[in-house]
Curated annotation (Swiss-Prot):
GO terms for molecular function: calcium ion binding; calcium-dependent protein binding; identical protein binding; magnesium ion binding; protein dimerization activity; protein heterodimerization activity; protein homodimerization activity; protein-macromolecule adaptor activity. The modification N-acetylalanine is found at residue 2. Its main location: endoplasmic reticulum. It comes from Rattus norvegicus (Rat). This is Programmed cell death protein 6. Residues 23-58, 59-89, 90-125, 126-161, 162-191 form the EF-hand domain. The keyword Manganese does not apply. Ca(2+) 2 binds at residues 103, 105, 107, 109, 114. The keyword Acetylation applies. GO terms for biological process: angiogenesis; apoptotic process; cellular response to heat; COPII vesicle coating; endoplasmic reticulum to Golgi vesicle-mediated transport; intracellular protein transport; negative regulation of phosphatidylinositol 3-kinase/protein kinase B signal transduction; negative regulation of TOR signaling. Ca(2+) 1 binds at residues 36, 38, 40, 42, 47. The lineage of its organism: Eukaryota, Metazoa, Chordata, Craniata, Vertebrata.
């Protein structure tokens, strides 16, 4: 058996709070049509990736794009229709606002100190060593900082892991006891 700890804070869980209102539907429809290159009525992960900017002149993380599409694709069509796209638009816009809030030096990147503030703001109480692990895991450019798209991905993964942990933390004391196979099941449901 293995034990793992998480100290839940109030409302712990990364993610943007309810953000700004959506732009008008005609604006979003025009954006949708520009992104839907093949005119299928569905934006694929490749189309969305090409349309997104992470602010570093590198392609948006394809894993992040697939994660976002899977959250909003209610019909398992490997893409989002216009109705679902409005949710994607709001989700990404809300994340941009969160990112800008914690990017205190306006570098377009989140460093370890800014990440710690962001996660603390989400209710997480994690060690400096764990913040180092997150930076190493989600820093695709090897600069000790996380770009916007990788910040989203890191928060998505952290939330999924936290959700799984909470299912096993029945007494909500921040400790769980799981068998090796349960542990593997938890990990493989994320990767």
């Amino acid at each position: 058996m293995a034990a793992y700890s998480y100290r839940p804070g109030p409302g712990a869980g990364p993610g943007p709070a309810a953000g700004a209102a959506l732009p008008d539907q005609s604006f979003l429809w025009n954006v949708f049509q520009r992104v839907d290159k093949d005119r299928s009525g569905v934006i694929s992960d490749n189309e969305l990736q090409q349309a997104l900017s992470n602010g570093t002149w590198t392609p948006f993380n394809p894993v992040t794009v697939r994660s976002i599409i899977s959250m909003f694709d209610r019909e398992n069509k490997a893409g989002v229709n216009f109705s679902e796209f409005t949710g994607v638009w709001k989700y990404i816009t809300d994340w941009q606002n969160v990112f800008r809030t914690y990017d205190r030096d306006n570098s377009g990147m989140i460093d370890k100190h800014e990440l710690k503030q962001a996660l603390s703001g989400f209710g997480y109480r994690l060690s400096d060593q764990f913040h180092d692990i997150l930076i190493r895991k989600f820093d695709r450019q090897g600069r000790g900082q996380i770009a916007f798209d990788d910040f989203i991905q890191g928060c998505i993964v952290l939330q999924r892991l936290t959700d799984i942990f909470r299912r096993y933390d029945t007494d909500q004391d921040g400790w769980i006891q799981v068998s090796y196979e349960q542990y593997l099941s938890m990990v493989f449901s994320i990767v």
